Structure formats: structure tokens, C-alpha cells
Amino acid sequence: LKAQTDKGLIRLGNKDFKHGNYSEAEVNYRKSLEKEYNAKAEFNLGDALYEQKNYEEAAKAFSAVTERNTTSEIEADSYYNLGNTMMAQEKYAEAFEAYKNSLKINPNDEDARYNLEYARWKLIQQQQQQQQQQDQQDQQQQDKEQEEKDQQQQQQQQQQDQQQQEENQEQQQQQQQQDQQQQQEMSKE
């Protein structure tokens, strides 16, 4: 009777899932798992969470299935769905690893093979974009440092120009004083 109840909850969850009632399906799968662990219920829970865009919890469910002793089909499908979940979160390196693990178990899965290559492509794009952003930040930092250096040089040049101007004025004043003294001396004679 206990196994019947657990399977009944799974069937009820499957029915809810089929009709698009993902939150109800989630509840039924969780109730089933509370009674007794069942890899299929955990897998289906992951699917229900994924459909609700609760990717972190879905990833936990799929990962839990892969860590249990299950059939190779469920394990391969769990890795595949884990890959899809990681792709939805733009975690391309993790998605790549999940698809790779799925293909180790089921090397004939063409969908997993396609998704593996797509994840690889997205990962390369992401890395290139990150490199471009880093290069841009580095360039901005260099530009800022150069601008500060230019401003310092400009200030130093202005100070030097001002000092030179003051020295020139002082020399002119001294020269004028000397000229006046000479004129006074000449006028006395």
C-alpha cells in the first residue's frame, strides 16, 4: 500500500505536469520523495522546477539523481537536463560538463551531442566577451592614468611658466632700479 501511494503521487504529479500545472506537479513529487526516495520522482521534480524557471532548485534535483545509483538512462537524462538548466542560467562551462557526462553514459544521444557543441560555442563566446571587457577596462585604466599624468605635467609646466614669469619680472624690476640709479648718479654729476 505504501509503494502504491508513492507511485500514485508520482502519477498525479505526472498528470499535473502534462497539463502544465508545474507547481502542483512539484508538490506531488516532493510529497512522494518525503515518503520514499525514487529517482524518477526526483527527476520529474527537476523537470517541474525547470518549467517554473527555478533553475537552481532544478539543478539540485538533477544533480541528486546523478549521485544516486539509478539506471543509466535516468542518469544520462539527468545530466542532459542539468546541462539544459545550466544553459538557461548562462553557466556554459557547467552545461558543457553535464552534456559531456550525459554522452559518456549514452554516446548515441544526438541532442546531447548538439547541445555539447552549442555549450562549447557559447562558452567560447562568453570567454571572448569577458576578455574584451577586461581589455576595455584595462584601456580605460591606462587612459585615466595617462590623463592624470598629462594633468600633472600641465600643472608642472604652468608652475614653471609662472616661476619664469616672476623671475623675469624681478629681473626687469632690478634692471629698472639699476637704470634709475645710474640715471640719478649721472644727473648728480
Regions found by a protein language model. Give the residues of each.
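Short, charged, low-hydrophobicity "junction" segments
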Residues: 28-36, 89-96
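Feature detects intrinsically disordered, low-complexity acidic/polar segments
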Residues: 47, 52-189
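TPR-adjacent "capping" and linker segments in tetratricopeptide-repeat scaffold/adaptor proteins
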Residues: 1-8, 69-72
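Alpha-helical segment of the N-proximal tetratricopeptide repeat
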Residues: 4-35, 51
